[in-house]
Amino acid sequence: MAVRIRLKRFGAKKRPFYRIVVADSRSPRDGRFIDEIGYYNPIAQPAEIKIDVEKAKKWLSVGAQPSDTVKSLFKKEGIIGNSVSQ
């Protein structure tokens, strides 16, 4: 089972709010997920990011691959360095 760390969209039209979730790569964007590890609110000024660092590191250690957007959020929060390969 390929596991991805990605964003699950919530919020109203043109007012997105995202939860950072761990999900099977085959499930739909807003479908079933395995674990929720945080949230991201791009509308707030500055953008609001809350990530459970322990859960994120645990999932990365067992092989979960972050999406490009989640990878950039992890870099902003200092969870991963710049030398992480795909």
From Swiss-Prot:
Give the superkingdom in one word.
Answer: Bacteria
Q: Which family does it belong to?
A: Belongs to the bacterial ribosomal protein bS16 family.
Which InterPro entries would you find in this protein's record?
Answer: Ribosomal_bS16, Ribosomal_bS16_CS, Ribosomal_bS16_dom_sf
GO BP field: translation
Q: What is this protein called?
A: Small ribosomal subunit protein bS16
Q: Which GO terms describe its molecular function?
A: structural constituent of ribosome
Key words of the record: Ribonucleoprotein, Ribosomal protein
Q: Where is the signal peptide?
A: none
One GO term describing the cellular component: cytoplasm
